[in-house]
Amino acid sequence: VAEEIAQHTLDETELGDYNGKFLKISTKTRAALMDIIDDKSVGIIEEDVERNIVKIAKPVGVIGALSPSTNPEATPVIKAINAVKGRNAIVVAPHPRAKLTNKMIIDNMRAALEKMGAPADLVQDVGIVSLEKTNELMKQCDLILATGGAAMVGAAYSSGTPALGVGAGNAVITVDETADIVDAAEKIRISKTLDLAASCSADNSVIA
């Protein structure tokens, strides 16, 4: 499946490269899952007995996820993992340039949910992709997760719905005197060139 999605994404968006997209689908999404798989995400998640403070997590409801053309193979998956982990439903509105890729990914996630005995409708897409549909999703959902250009993230923040946004990336890497310079340089190179730096999380600046 990862091979098919990687090639389909490249063909549709004409952004990045096959190897980068394959790695993001097969490793980055899995790593995101493993980071939180054992974390408690609903109910009492933290308790300070001495101060009599209890932190309780609960679902927010339906999450509206806006997905970019630069990382459509991984962003919807990672957002869906986090949404479902918190017992939320999620509806993904893709960039028009990646609508078919998004449909393929959503269909795969829905099939996986059904296979596990969970409701497939926990993960959905908006259907026909349009600006009007995306704007309506932002009005109707309980929380927006917006990843994309500055204008789109700005629209999410101005929608009247609580929103978390990520716009243009500027990932800064700090290399101090304790670092293995050769190892650091190689890791920065890999990050900057992965998927031809299509993702906003690619290393962009170095402080040494």
Task: Give the predicted meaning of each segment.
Residues 1-53:
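N-terminal Rossmann-like NAD(P)+-binding subdomain of aldehyde/semialdehyde dehydrogenases
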Residues 35-111, 116, 159-161, 170:
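Conserved small-residue-rich beta-alpha loop and adjacent elements
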Residues 42-55, 123-141:
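A structured beta-alpha segment of the ubiquitous adenosine-cofactor-binding alpha/beta core
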Residues 57, 143-152, 163, 179:
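Buried, small/hydrophobic-residue-enriched core segments of structured protein domains
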Residues 61, 142, 204:
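Conserved acidic residues
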Residues 78, 85-86, 153-208:
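ALDH superfamily catalytic-core signature
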Residues 92, 124-127, 145-148, 163-166, ...:
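General beta-strand structural signal in soluble alpha/beta enzymes
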